[in-house]
Amino acid sequence: EEAAKKAEIRQTNKKAYVNESPFYSVLETQKNNLVTTRANTSYVYTPNLTKVSVEVRTYNDIPDDVKTFESYFEGLFPNCRKISGASSIYNCHSYAWHLSAWNNPYWMPDPRDYWGDGSYVKYNPGSYFQASTRAVFKIGSSNNADNWHSVLIRKAYTGTTKYVVAESKWGPYGLYEHYLLDNPWAVNSSWVTH
C-alpha cells in the first residue's frame, strides 16, 4: 500500500516524490551536478565495434553523506549483498555492458549502442532467464539514459522474476548482488532484457 502511494506521488508530483524519497533526492542532487567528478572523454567498443563515449573520471568524489545514504538504501533492500563500496568512477551501464569488474575505470552515460547496433538482441525471457544477459530499467517513458538502470543477470533461472539473481552498480553507490526486481529502479518502471 505504501509503495502504491509513493508511485502515485511520483507520477503526479515529481518534486513531492523527491522530497518524500531520500533515494530520489540524492539522484536529483547528482543529476543537478551537486555531486561532481572531474572526467576526460574516452571510448569503448560494442562487440560489433560501434564506438561508445565514456568518461574516465580522474577523482573518486564521494561525499560523506552519500555513504550515509548507501547504508540507508541497504536497509530498504535487505536481500541485497554489497560486492564493493561507493564509487563515482564507474556506473551501472559500464558494469553491465562493458566490463563487469569492481575496478572498472569507465562511467558510461548511455548504453543504447550496445543493442542499437545488434550486439545484443532484445528478448522476452518468459520463464527462463539466461546468465550473462542484461536488463535495462526505464523509469517512466523517458528516452533519457539518465533515467535508466542497467543490470547484469548472473545466474540462469527458470521460473518467476522473483528469484532471478543479478548484479548492478547503484549510481555513485555500491555494487550489489540482488534479485532482478529488488533494486531502487524497479519500482514504477518498465524493463527489457537483452
Task: Annotate each PLM feature.
Residues 1-18:
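Mature extracellular/secreted ectodomains of secretory-pathway proteins
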Residues 24-113:
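N-terminal capping segments
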Residues 13, 19-31, 194:
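A recurrent domain-boundary module in secreted/ectodomain proteins
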Residues 171-194:
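Glycine- and charge-enriched low-complexity intrinsically disordered segments
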Residues 11-12, 39, 135:
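Positively charged, low-complexity intrinsically disordered regions
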Residues 86, 90, 153-156, 187-188:
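A structural signal for short, hydrophobic beta-strand segments that form beta-sheets
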Residues 108-174:
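...with weaker cross-activation on analogous glycine-rich loops/strands in unrelated enzymes
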